[in-house]
Design a protein with these regions (language model features):
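Acidic, Ser/Thr/Pro
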Residues: 2-278
Length: 278
């Protein structure tokens, strides 16, 4: 029989109390700054890209992956031409690949798992990697993660089908990285909500032609996996093609909604500024 856990020492209790007080103060500050309404979804026929601004365009077949260097000030548009249920993305700082996208911090720092136009994606060092500058469906998932051989076996009865876990490992290998360099991904076009403490898929929110635009706030190595989300409905593995477009984005301004949407986003951009000045 195990011994009862000892009570925390007084100094430990004081540290816990101080950390909780700081957490509550930060949350209150964030709640006070975050606007009541983020921008509405982008129209599917809106936000056209001028041809002269496009640096690269490529179609990624269903089940496959894509990786590219995206420079600060450029944006990646992912066009879901066939309403594939889920496209996963991961990113590394191109100049210090120990810094990478962090789903947990992205959700925690912004006090929300609703990542949509006006929000940002954080690294594990508190800097902003991507800003979501256009978004037609506003239905994305940073909680569940990408597909694996095990999730494919459960959903489709075949663990050999291509998965995001395997695609990310292949993409990482293109840059000399390994499994330890990959963390949980964000899945776009994946309408997942937490209901009664469990993640659930909400049907009918993704349509052909939906797109999301991610502006790079640092030079990034980016990996994209075109595999269905683990919770995607249906028993047939039929991911359709997507289109990845890298283009020169309009420059960010001081009142950019992604920069000003919350106190946490402002701090993230300030961290970027300090890093870029060094």
């Amino acid at each position: 029989m195990s011994s009862p856990r000892p009570e925390p020492q007084a100094d430990t209790q004081a540290t816990i109390a101080a950390n909780r007080a700081r957490y509550e103060a930060l949350k209150q500050a964030g709640d006070g700054v975050t606007p009541r309404h983020l921008p509405p979804p982008t129209a599917r026929d809106g936000a056209p890209i001028a041809e002269e601004c496009i640096r690269h365009k490529e179609t990624v077949p269903g089940g496959w992956y894509w990786t590219k260097l995206i420079r600060r000030g450029e944006a990646l548009r992912i066009v879901n031409t066939s309403a594939t249920p889920g496209v996963s993305v991961f990113a590394w700082n191109a100049h210090d690949t120990s810094e990478r996208y962090n789903s947990a911090d992205t959700v925690k720092i912004q006090w929300t798992s609703e990542l949509r136009k006006g929000r940002v994606l954080f690294s594990d060092m508190g800097r902003v990697l991507f800003s979501i500058i256009e978004d037609t469906c506003c239905a994305h998932d940073a909680i569940v993660g990408g597909s694996t051989p095990a999730s494919n076996a459960r959903a489709y009865g075949d663990a050999s089908l291509r998965s995001t876990a395997e695609n990310m490992l292949l993409a990482a290998g293109k840059h000399g990285f390994g499994r330890r360099d990959i963390a949980p991904v964000i899945s776009f076009f994946s309408p997942v909500s937490i209901i009664d403490g469990r993640p659930q898929w909400r049907d009918g929110l993704v349509a052909p032609g939906d797109f999301v635009d991610l502006r790079a706030e640092l030079d990034l190595l980016v990996a994209v996996s075109n595999c269905p989300h683990p919770l995607a409905p249906g028993s047939d593995y039929t991911p359709g093609p997507i289109e990845c477009v890298v283009y020169r984005a309009p420059p960010s301004t001081a009142d950019d909604i992604c920069r000003t949407a919350s106190a946490e986003a402002q701090r993230g951009f300030e961290n970027n500024d300090l890093y870029l000045e060094a």
